[in-house]
Swiss-Prot record:
Protein name (Swiss-Prot/TrEMBL): Pyridoxal 5'-phosphate synthase subunit PdxT
Originating gene: pdxT
Species: Sulfurisphaera tokodaii (strain DSM 16993 / JCM 10545 / NBRC 100140 / 7)
HAMAP family per UniProt: PdxT
GO function terms (MF aspect): glutaminase activity; pyridoxal 5'-phosphate synthase (glutamine hydrolysing) activity
Substrates-to-products reaction catalysed: aldehydo-D-ribose 5-phosphate + D-glyceraldehyde 3-phosphate + L-glutamine = pyridoxal 5'-phosphate + L-glutamate + phosphate + 3 H2O + H(+); L-glutamine + H2O = L-glutamate + NH4(+)
Keyword set, alphabetical order: Glutamine amidotransferase, Hydrolase, Lyase, Pyridoxal phosphate
Taxonomic lineage: Archaea, Thermoproteota, Thermoprotei, Sulfolobales, Sulfolobaceae
Keyword Hydrolase recorded: yes
The protein's assembly and partners: In the presence of PdxS, forms a dodecamer of heterodimers. Only shows activity in the heterodimer.
């Protein structure tokens, strides 16, 4: 199994480590590759788009010609996990809490509306206990950093977890979006969920 992690910025190392832990837990042999150019997506079985600055990731991906390739792979059904900024890039509809509608390069394949910087400056980063029972996990502590929020799902997209009535995790077919950082949490359940999807 080959898992590609988009590696322009954001917590690539942490995702790689968490993916390795998840593979070990599931007793699956796998390679983790850094995705920086279209060729790096060759033969990947799953894709992770980490957090970071979503506009930067989108612009760089577009410049290097990988955005269209990513979109094609994702639309063809490759299991994909987008975390924080990665969730923004997957979304069809993006608004910024401060400046309103935002024009930025997106993959835009997932039927979700996302508000960037939802929690505002006061809650730049925080930890919370969330319920991951929908994907076989339990209650677990996770980290939010300048987190967005998923404010609406439609079509085939459905919420998987909420925090105070706000959607923090959603899924549509092969795509999973989280507004928190699972790679900075103690549980590997989200990475395991992605690997299991890729194994089907």
């Amino acid at each position: 199994m080959k898992i590609g992690i988009v590696a322009y910025q954001g917590s690539f190392e942490e995702h790689a480590l968490q993916t390795k832990r998840a593979l070990d837990n599931l007793k699956i042999q796998g390679d983790i590759v850094a995705v920086k150019k279209p060729n790096d997506l060759k033969d990947v079985d799953a894709i992770i788009i980490p957090g970071g600055e979503s506009t930067t990731i989108g612009v760089v991906a577009q410049k290097l010609g990988i955005l269209d390739e990513l979109k094609e792979k994702i639309n063809s059904g490759i299991p994909t996990l987008g975390t924080c900024a990665g969730a923004i890039i997957l979304a069809k509809d993006v608004t910024d809490a401060k400046v309103g509608k935002k024009s930025q390069p997106l993959i835009g394949s997932m039927d979700i509306s996302v508000i960037r910087n939802y929690y505002g400056r006061q809650r730049e980063s925080f930890e919370a206990t969330v319920d991951l029972s929908e994907i076989g996990g339990g209650k677990t502590r996770v980290v939010f950093i300048r987190a967005p929020a998923i404010v609406k799902t439609w079509g085939d997209a459905k919420p998987l977890s909420k925090l105070n009535d706000v959607i923090i995790m959603a899924m549509e077919r092969n795509m999973v979006a989280t507004t928190f950082h699972p790679e900075l949490s103690s549980t590997t359940v989200i990475h395991e969920f992605l690997i299991k999807m890729a194994k089907k």
